[in-house]
Each structure stands twice: as structure tokens, then as C-alpha cells.
């Protein structure tokens, strides 16, 4: 049944504490969508101007693509972090962390317990790195020689099996069961040898067995943007390749060379730079968000349907079990709650949940897993001056707003959904009269939020901002990396998410990436790793609960422990 919610349950306040800190790392940002990350995160810059793209308007069609018409003004798209940067971050397996060393054409296999390092040779200029599921193995894509390497560390030294891909590719996607890899062109660059839409489908079982026919080139359409594997009962059965105006489905069971191909709705191919594609973990549910028309599209593997919305959505996310989608409707300050598949078949059943308090909904943050206490969304905007965010219980639509002391740049929820990290942005043009409040506005910083109680705590970081973060595997702690290049000050803040208290720990050099170290018997579950800028390669393993920092330097040497 379709209905409109607008229930506000209250406001939470908190106490401000101060601390000094360091300088930011500027990274890639993308408007209207992005690539989901793992245990770690990348923190974007401040969202930019809230207006522009055409000035006055009566409809979003009068605005620059990606902008929406809000109250007669073309408003900029929300800024959502792109966690998939050009340089592949390290990845973790049950026992090891693997990190690329592009200049030395190698991968460092690091034991996070002993910090022993093994330099594993791969093809020149490695650009892609992914861990195989549930085993100590990884796959590496190398650009210069167009090769793919499988690293097997079940026994040491690591066994390397390399295969040629016939051409250069910049992107790597693994199937959830680890049976296949897809190497495909970087959508931001011209394809190698002008081969538009050609990608390589690699049978990893054949690669590891040393049999022939492990690499098959396939035609995926013009301008590939997304590659998604579909699994059934834990087995990969199909590969969906989204291009500018088509989606091609390749049958992994029969191995047919030609796909089943469908045309995408015109609204989904009008601006491929900003359209968003989201999928459930098994690839069973795939949805697309247009930035030029008030509609979504759904793809179930065989057909595409459009789903009308009352306005252009500024964000789209699937709940973890794929049973519903949540779309941000910024102009009306509401979200659309779409039950899957019922509301895809009968869009009249879509629920519209209004904040009811004048708040803005530009971005949505959902828990990585469905909480035992029920699903909810944290909603906020990156292009307004609001120093608030709201929780929406789903599907009931109960809204609780929380007042903060600073503007919101990003919100990320912990693996257990009990805590959230709120990254703030500075306001150098603050008009606050109180000198203390003005200083808080000008500072960078972050807040940690306890979902159940509604309590939050601000951590100020002075004139610089946080750059990376990673939650511990089971929740309970989060690490936030800070940097100040001018002062050569590099730190990590370990935050206890139970007490909301931060502890500052030293880092040896500039933090680049962060990630989670998987839990292991007899070892603290609160370990994260931080890769750092160093000529020979450097990585630190931090125990967030004890504050122990252990650093390994020298990916191309035998390695030395600091």
C-alpha cells in the first residue's frame, strides 16, 4: 500500500571536545553515485557550491545534467565518495595482506602478525588487485604487458600463475565465488587499440590448473561502465555488462560467445558519467538511477523495467538483503522506499517517506547488514549548510533528527550497524559571533555516533581533515587517518565506539589507504592496516583496542620492522 510518512521523534544534542590534528589528502570524487568500498573508506573533499547549473528553473530539465530544480534554483549534485581510486588499495585475506608495488612490478605479501614480507613478481605496472574469497590468494591485473596473475599463498613461497590477455585493460572484477575474473577497459580512458567494449573473461580455475582456453575475449557493447556477476546458490551463472545504452548478459554455464542484449531506457544512457548502478551481493537485483529524468530502472537478468518517481533521485541504495531500495528525493525532503520485487511490478505501491521538518535528503547511508533491531537509513546532504542528519526507520517511516555542530561531508556505518562515522567539512566563511563556535566551524573534524542511544561526540582536527578510515571487522572500533604534509605530521585516531573516546597514534609516513585485517583465532578482532607513501613501500598494522602500531618497510627488499 502506498502512503506518505512524516513523523519526527526528537532531537539529540552533545558536548564538544577539542583536539589538534593534520593535513588532508585530496582524492577523486564523483557526483551522483560511486563505487562501494570494503572495510575502509576514502573521505571526499567538501561538496562545492550548492547552486549553479543554470540559475532559475521550474523543472530539472532546465538544469545542467545532474543538477535538480529545488525551490526555483538549479542545485548541484550530491558528492558521493569514489572508493575505487586509480591506484588499487591493499586487500586482506584470512592470513595475509597484499599490497601493490607498481614501480617494482611486484605485490607484497605481508603477514600482519609477524610483519614478514614476501615480494611476489607480477606483470609490469599492476593496476588491479583483488582477493579471492575465503583463501589466501589474490588476482593482479597488469597494464603494460596486458597480463593477469593469480597469487596462491596457501603454501609458501607464493605460487604465481600468469596469463596473457591479448590487450591492455584498466579494471578488474572478480566473481563472488572466485571462479571468474573480468578485465575491462577503464571507462575514463580510450580503450587499448581502439577496441570499444571488448573485455576479457578469465576462467580462474583453468588458469590455476594450467589448462588452455582460460581467457576469452567478449564484446560487451559501446563504452562499458559496470560489470556485475550473478550467482545462484553460491555459484556464478551469468555476467551482466552495462554499457552506455545496453546491458549484455553472458551465460557462464554454457559459455556462449554472444550475449543476450537489451537496450537501456533513454534516461539511463543520456549521461553515463553520472548515472548510478547498484546491485545486490548476488547480482540478482540490479537498479539504475538516472540524473536527467524522474525514474529508476530495474534489471532482473532477463528484462528491464522503468520505475517512475515524483522527482529526480539524488542517491540510490539497496538494503543489504536486496528486498528493498531506498532513493533520496532532495527537492521534497523525502525518500522513496521501494519493495523488491513488488513495487517494481506495481510502482503505485512505492512508499514516500517525508522528513516532515524541512530537512534535506541528498545522500543515504545504510547498514552493511540488516540489524537485528530492524532496518534504518541515515540521511544527509553534502550541498547544504545544514549541521544535522536524520535517521529513518524502515519501513515504518519514523524520523529522528540529530543536531550536530558542523556540516556533514560523509556518513559511514560500522559492519554491525551500531555506530556511524560522520566526516565534517570546514566552514571558513562562518558568521558565528562566539569565538569558540567560530573556531569549531572553521576546523575540520569528525563525529562518532552511537545508533541505539543517539549519542554522538565531535573530534576536531584543526585546519586539516581526516583522509581515510576503516572499521574493525566486528565493529567496536574505527581508525581514522590524518595527515599534515606541511608539518610532516601523520597520525591515526583509534576511536572506541562504545565510549566514543579517541586515542591518537603515530604513523611513520603519509597514509594512503586503509583496510580491515580479517579476524583470526587468538588475535584481537580490532586490527586495521594503513599503507603509506614510501619509496620502498610501507604498511602499518594497528590494534585499535590496545594502540599497538607495527610497521613494515621495504616491499622490494626483505623488509624491516619498525
Residue ranges and their predicted role:
Residues 104-105, 145-147, 187-192, 244-246, ...:
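Short glycine/acidic-enriched loop and turn motifs that connect beta-strands
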Residues 94-95, 135-136, 177-179, 234-237, ...:
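Short coil/turn segments that connect the beta-strands within blades of beta-propeller domains
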Residues 73-120, 129, 138:
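An edge-strand/N-cap motif at the start of beta-rich repeat modules
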Residues 81-89, 124-133, 167-176, 219-231, ...:
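Repeated scaffold domains used in trafficking and secretory/extracellular systems
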Residues 115-121, 157-163, 208-219, 256-268, ...:
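A short beta-strand motif characteristic of beta-propeller blades
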Residues 516, 523, 527-562:
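Blade-level signature of beta-propeller repeat domains, shared across WD40, Kelch, NHL, RCC1
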Residues 15-78, 87-89:
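Ser/Thr-rich, Pro/Gly/Ala-heavy low-complexity intrinsically disordered linkers and tails
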Residues 99, 140, 183, 240-241, ...:
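Residue position within the beta-strands of beta-propeller blades
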Amino acid at each position: 500500500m502506498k502512503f506518505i510518512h512524516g513523523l519526527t521523534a526528537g532531537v539529540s544534542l552533545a558536548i564538544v571536545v577539542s583536539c589538534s590534528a593534520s593535513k588532508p589528502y585530496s582524492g577523486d570524487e564523483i557526483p551522483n553515485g560511486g563505487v562501494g568500498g570494503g572495510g575502509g573508506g576514502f573521505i571526499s573533499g567538501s561538496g562545492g557550491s550548492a547552486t549553479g547549473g543554470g540559475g532559475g528553473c521550474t523543472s530539472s530539465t532546465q538544469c545542467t545534467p545532474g543538477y535538480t530544480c529545488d525551490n526555483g534554483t538549479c542545485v548541484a549534485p550530491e558528492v558521493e565518495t569514489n572508493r575505487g581510486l586509480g591506484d588499487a588499495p591493499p586487500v586482506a585475506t584470512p592470513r595475509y595482506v597484499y599490497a601493490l608495488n607498481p614501480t617494482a612490478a611486484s605485490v607484497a605479501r605481508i603477514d600482519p602478525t609477524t610483519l614478514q614480507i614476501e615480494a611476489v613478481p607480477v606483470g609490469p605496472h599492476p593496476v588491479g588487485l583483488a582477493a579471492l574469497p575465503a583463501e589466501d590468494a589474490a588476482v593482479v591485473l597488469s597494464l603494460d604487458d596486458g597480463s593477469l596473475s593469480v597469487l596462491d599463498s596457501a603454501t609458501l613461497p607464493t605460487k604465481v600463475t600468469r596469463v596473457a590477455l591479448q590487450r591492455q585493460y584498466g579494471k578488474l572484477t572478480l566473481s563472488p565465488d572466485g571462479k571468474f575474473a573480468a578485465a575491462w577497459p577503464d571507462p575514463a580512458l580510450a580503450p587499448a587499440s581502439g577496441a570499444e567494449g571488448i573485455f576479457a573473461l578469465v576462467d580462474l580455475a583453468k588458469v590455476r590448473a594450467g589448462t588452455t582456453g582460460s581467457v576469452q575475449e567478449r564484446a560487451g557493447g559501446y563504452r562499458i561502465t559496470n560489470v556485475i556477476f550473478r550467482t545462484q546458490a553460491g555459484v556464478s551463472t551469468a555476467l551482466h555488462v552495462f554499457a552506455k545504452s545496453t546491458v549484455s548478459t553472458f551465460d557462464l554455464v554454457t559459455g556462449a560467445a554472444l550475449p543476450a542484449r537489451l537496450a537501456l531506457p533513454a534516461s539511463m544512457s543520456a549521461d553515463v558519467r553520472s548515472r548510478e548502478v547498484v546491485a545486490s551481493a548476488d547480482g540478482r537485483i540490479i537498479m539504475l538511477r538516472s540524473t536527467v529524468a524522474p525514474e529508476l530502472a530495474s534489471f532482473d537478468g532477463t528484462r528491464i523495467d522503468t520505475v517512475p518517481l515524483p522527482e529526480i533521485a539524488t542517491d540510490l541504495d539497496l538494503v543489504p538483503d536486496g528486498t528493498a531500495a531506498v532513493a533520496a528525493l532532495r527537492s521534497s525532503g523525502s525518500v522513496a522506499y521501494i519493495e523488491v520485487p513488488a513495487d517494481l511490478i506495481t510502482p503505485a505501491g512505492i512508499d514516500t517517506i517525508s522528513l516532515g521538518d524541512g530537512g534535506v535528503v541528498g545522500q543515504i547511508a545504510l547498514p552493511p547488514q540488516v540489524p537485528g533491531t530492524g532496518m534504518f537509513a541515515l540521511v544527509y546532504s553534502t550541498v547544504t549548510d545544514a549541521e544535522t542528519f536524520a535517521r529513518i526507520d524502515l519501513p515504518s517511516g519514523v524520523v529522528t533528527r540529530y543536531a550536530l555542530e558542523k556540516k556533514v561531508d560523509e556518513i559511514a556505518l560500522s559492519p554491525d550497524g551500531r555506530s556511524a562515522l560522520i566526516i565534517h567539512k570546514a566552514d571558513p566563511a562562518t558568521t558565528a559571533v562566539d569565538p569558540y563556535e567560530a573556531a569549531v566551524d572553521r576546523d575540520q573534524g569528525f563525529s562518532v555516533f552511537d545508533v541505539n542511544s543517539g549519542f554522538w561526540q565531535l573530534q576536531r582536527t584543526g585546519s586539516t581533515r581526516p583522509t581515510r578510515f576503516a572499521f574493525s571487522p566486528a565493529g567496536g572500533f574505527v581508525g581514522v587517518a590524518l595527515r599534515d604534509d606541511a608539518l610532516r605530521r601523520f597520525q591515526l585516531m583509534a576511536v572506541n565506539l562504545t565510549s566514543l573516546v579517541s586515542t591518537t597514534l603515530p604513523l611513520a609516513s603519509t597514509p594512503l589507504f586503509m583496510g580491515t585485517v580479517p579476524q583470526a583465532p587468538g588475535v584481537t578482532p580490532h586490527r586495521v592496516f594503513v599503507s603509506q607513501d614510501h619509496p620502498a613501500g610501507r604498511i602499518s598494522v594497528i590494534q585499535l583496542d590496545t594502540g599497538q602500531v607495527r610497521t613494515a618497510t621495504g616491499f622490494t627488499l626483505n623488509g624491516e620492522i619498525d
